[in-house]
Regions:
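Extended, well-ordered alpha-helical scaffold segments
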Residues: 23-37, 94-110, 139-155, 199-217, ...
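Extended ligand-binding clefts on enzyme/binding-domain cores
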Residues: 181-300, 314, 337-351
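Carbohydrate-binding/catalytic loop surfaces
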Residues: 50-73, 124-137, 164-183, 223-252, ...
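Bacterial Sec-dependent signal peptides at the C-terminal "C-region" and cleavage site
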Residues: 12-23
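Extended ligand-binding groove/face enriched in aromatic
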Residues: 92, 96-186, 190, 194, ...
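Low-complexity, Ser/Thr/Pro/Gly-enriched N-terminal "stalk/linker" regions
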Residues: 21-80, 88, 92, 96-97, ...
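Conserved small/polar residues in nucleotide/adenosyl-binding loops
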Residues: 386-395
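Well-ordered alpha-helical scaffold segments within catalytic/enzyme domains
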Residues: 80-95, 111-112, 125-139, 188-201, ...
Length: 397
């Protein structure tokens, strides 16, 4: 049985609003719970006529108890997370029926490899689904879908600016000539993978260029991030940094900073350039310094109503996953500090304060995707994926 020990000091540091976790984080127990919730979701998706494999669980609002599902389309950025959940669950349980379900849901996204890019979310859509599928099965058809989709994502790269255009649909309505959102850092992983697995080597250059320009322009002097960077397409210069899903242009949106932490950890992994390792630590440290005691952030670090403002479990899960990896690249002292922080985060997320339990078929409660738009609030498939990935991370470092 796989257990991670949580020190006494960690336990004592937890705030009273969170159920006190035990002295160990039992990863198998956590994954067993996720497997049970995955089965509940599958049961909920079944109808008298079977399962519609193009309909993906997306979110469960605070006053609801069942998944809201969305059709897998090029516009639906969350559609790759549920297949990814199934692949991770199969990896743990070795349940062949789960593998079959993962294959069927994954196959419903194949069209994305043959469709012009709608926006930057192709990495979320395809690498979470086909990427995990290929990792576990080595199905050559999956590999080709990833390679083709990486080429599609590359069409959004603007060499004058040096980054990928995130939201073509917002160019005219918001007068954002070339916009790049922090979420885009996650999609670089697919480009790196494709470049070293038979794809165009230029994909590597795109990923590095995007990481460099984002590092230069999308962070404040204190290493907190802007959600959106708006660039001039003629000069390539930054026009402004703004928010879209955070509280204000000047604040640190929790999930955006989480994307940055994970993204630059990946960029270091793929390049081994020490400047990215240094930067990953800087964006991590400002995040850790401002966390509440239970290590689960408020949805924005300057949100109104703190300490009663909503938390974002999805950001915590993303950061926990990143720090478990980042800790392996650093000397014992620093690495241990990051690993311990990740364990504290996972201990909180596995407590009764954050688990959905029997109330909902999701893994966790208290996520915030887009508070200003009241979207993806409370339980989301995004956090189900990132939470499961965080627990699986030690298995493939």
């Amino acid at each position: 049985m796989k257990k991670i020990v949580v020190g006494l000091a960690v336990m004592l540091g937890f705030c009273t609003c969170v159920h006190q976790p035990s002295g160990t984080l039992d990863v198998n127990k956590a994954l067993d719970y996720c497997a049970e919730q995955t089965q509940r979701t599958l049961a909920e998706l079944k109808t008298d006529s079977g399962i519609d494999y193009t309909m993906m669980p997306r979110n469960i609002m605070t006053d609801e108890h069942h998944w809201n599902c969305r059709k897998a389309t090029k516009e639906e950025w969350c559609a790759g997370f549920w297949p990814g959940v199934l692949w991770y669950d199969y990896e743990y349980t070795k349940d062949k029926q789960i593998q079959k379900e993962a294959e069927k849901f994954t196959n419903s996204l194949e069209f994305l490899s043959k469709t012009p890019a709608f926006d930057h979310d192709l990495g979320f859509l395809v690498f979470c689904s086909y990427g995990n599928g290929y990792r576990l099965t080595k199905n050559p058809a999956y590999k080709q879908v990833i390679l083709d989709t990486a080429d599609t994502l590359a069409t959004l790269f603007n060499p004058i600016v040096g980054t990928i255009l995130s939201w073509p649909r917002e160019v005219e309505p918001r007068n954002w000539p070339h916009n790049t959102i922090m979420d885009n850092m996650i999609n670089l992983e697919m480009l790196f993978w494709a470049a070293k697995n038979g794809g165009n080597p230029y994909l590597y250059d795109i990923a590095v260029s995007h990481a460099d320009k984002t590092m230069k322009c999308q962070f404040r002097p204190d290493y907190t991030s802007y959600h959106v960077a708006v660039y001039d397409t003629i000069t390539g210069n930054l026009i402004k940094g703004v928010t879209h899903q955070g509280y204000a242009d000047s604040t640190m949106w929790a999930r955006g900073q989480a994307w940055a932490i994970y993204g630059y950890t990946v960029v270091y992994r793929e390049t081994k350039d020490p400047k990215y390792l240094d930067f990953a630590q800087k964006v991590t440290d400002v995040y850790l310094e401002r966390l509440p005691e239970d290590k689960v952030p408020y949805w924005d670090f300057s949100a109104p109503g703190i300490p009663d403002a909503p938390r974002d479990a999805s950001a915590a899960a993303v950061v926990a996953s990143a720090l478990l990896e980042l800790s392996t690249y650093l000397p014992n002292g620093t690495g241990k500090r990051y690993k311990d922080a990740a364990i504290e985060m996972l201990a909180s997320l596995n407590s009764d304060s954050y688990r959905s339990g029997k109330s909902k078929p999701s893994f966790l409660l208290h996520s915030v995707g887009h508070w200003p738009a009241h979207s993806e609030i409370d339980a989301s498939i995004t956090v189900s994926y990132t939470h499961l990935r965080a627990h699986e991370t030690p298995e493939h470092l």
